[in-house]
Each structure stands twice: as structure tokens, then as C-alpha cells.
Amino acid sequence: MKKAVILLNMGGPSSLLEVDMFLKNMFNDPRILPIKSPFFRSLVASFIANRRSETAKANYRKIGGKSPLIGHTFNLIQKLQSLDPSRFYTYAMRYTPPMTDMAVRELAQKEIEEVTLFSLYPQYSTTTTLSSIEEFHKQCALLSYFPKTKEIDRYFEDSNYNEAIIDRILEALGGDNPEEFTLIFSAHGLPQSVIDAGDPYEKEVHANIQALTKLLEERGITFKKITHAYQSKVGPMKWLEPSLDEVLKLHAKEKILLYPIAFTLDNSETDFELRIEYQEKATHLGITDYRVASCLNDSTRFAHAIIKLISQGEIS
């Protein structure tokens, strides 16, 4: 039986020419902008995208004119394929090429009979994980392609995954004393209304932090303090709290090590928002040592964790 694994993520522009596409596709997603009428949602999405276009392009210019996410994803695929040639590995992005329809068409052409959907979001959310999974099944139906499927839609409590995160945290410390640092686990924010409607994201972020805190204790790694924050708030609605701005103000003049807990791959919100925008805010607050740990990207330990999760969830 021919088996494949498809990594699911939101995507990001590969050039400045794709920024408008990325914004319009994202805000036209009913899981992001819950307007029932496709026509009116499309109008609102275009309006929001047009308002944000120039600012977004300016931000991307500061990190090389593109999102690093596509490159990291490709490198991870190469690593997985070399470690596990028994399966075909590919990926699908929700809002930019290579999009889900392209990936599904490739799987159908290869006559893949069994597909594991692997979310690159470690915690489950309707706005991210579910959106990507729904799109996969929609595109399969359009092609009348119905392979056996298995979904790995969260793995925030997996010990192998969390050990890979500890490795990244230690790399960022670089041998310095962790007791001198406040460790902040920063997660992408969501509107409070999404959580109130039953989305499990906030609970799973907290559970992930608890699992990592326990692992740090078991390994004898002690920080001055461990806390959490939410980043990337947009608009006037109430979002998850505390915000990263608030948490940094509380720890002004301290040494800060930040880990982006909601991301497995570095992207514009780590490379620009955390490493550039918040670096400037940290400096303004008197934080003289501000560090952002790298995401897992194509680390060998992360790749092995993915393969093990897939093997454990193998379709019988």
C-alpha cells in the first residue's frame, strides 16, 4: 500500500508579490472571518487585506522580502524523506502556494492509498488545524479521491516533541545561567470569543507549558521565572491575555528568553514580530538581554518525533 504524509500549515508569501494573496486568502477563510455569506466575506477580506497590504510588505522587506516558513517546511520535508523513505512526504499551505489542491492532485496522481495529515500546529484550534483539515477533505472530494486518512491534529503533550523544544531553549541560552533569565512562552493570540465558543487552544497552550515546565524541572534546568504571553493581537476585540507587551513591561530590566510555543517553524511572526519589533520594545523597556529561541524547523529531533507520532498512529 502506497503511504504518504502531508504536513499542513497556513503558509506565507514567497515574495512581496504574494503578500496580497496571502492576506486575502486568510481573511476570506470562514474559520478566520466567520461571515456566513461568501460574497460579503470576500468583500470584507479584500477591504482588510488592502488596508494592511503596504504595512505587511514593509515588514516582509525587513526579513528578506518573504516568509521563512516555506523554506523551513521544504527543509523539514527533505529531512523526513531521508529519515523515512517508506512514506512519501509532502506539504500543503492554506493560503499560499503550494496550496492544498496542488498537494491533493499530486497524491492522487501518485495513487497514494493512505494519507496521514500532520498538522504543524502543535495545539489544536478551529482557526488553524480544523481549517487545514477541512480544506484537505474538500479538495479530495472535488477530485473524487478518497484515500484512507489519519489525522495527527495535536501533539503538545508528546515527550519527544517537548524534548526537542528544550533543546532549542538550551541552544538560546548558549551556556548562560538560566536562573538569570525569565522564560516567556509566547503563543499566537486568538479573540476571546473563539475560546468562549469552545475552541480548546488556550487550554492546550497551558497544558503544553505545564509539560515543558515539568521536563525542565526533571532535567534540573531552573529559570528565574517561567510565564506566558499572547502576541499578534489585531483589531478592537478582546483577545487572550496577558499580552506580550504587558508581560515585557512587568519584567522590564530583566533578562528575557522567549520561546514561540504555538509555532513549530519560524515565520514572519517570529522573525519580524518577535526578533525585530519586540526587540525594539524590549530595548526601550531597559531589557539589555532579550533572546528569542528558534522554532524546531528541520531539527533532527523534531523530525524523529514526527515520524514516531506517525508510526504510532498508523492506520490498521
Swiss-Prot record:
The protein's Enzyme Commission number: 4.98.1.1
Keywords from the UniProt entry: Cytoplasm, Heme biosynthesis, Iron, Lyase, Metal-binding, Porphyrin biosynthesis
Reactions accelerated catalytically: heme b + 2 H(+) = protoporphyrin IX + Fe(2+)
Keyword Transmembrane helix on entry: no
GO BP annotation list: heme biosynthetic process
GO cellular component: cytoplasm
Residues that bind Fe cation: 188, 269
Matching Pfam families: Ferrochelatase
Cellular compartment(s): Cytoplasm
Pathway: Porphyrin-containing compound metabolism; protoheme biosynthesis; protoheme from protoporphyrin-IX: step 1/1
Known role: Catalyzes the ferrous insertion into protoporphyrin IX.
UniProt cross-references to HAMAP family, sorted A to Z: Ferrochelatase
Family, as annotated: Belongs to the ferrochelatase family.
Name of the protein in its database record: Ferrochelatase
Gene name, Swiss-Prot/TrEMBL: hemH
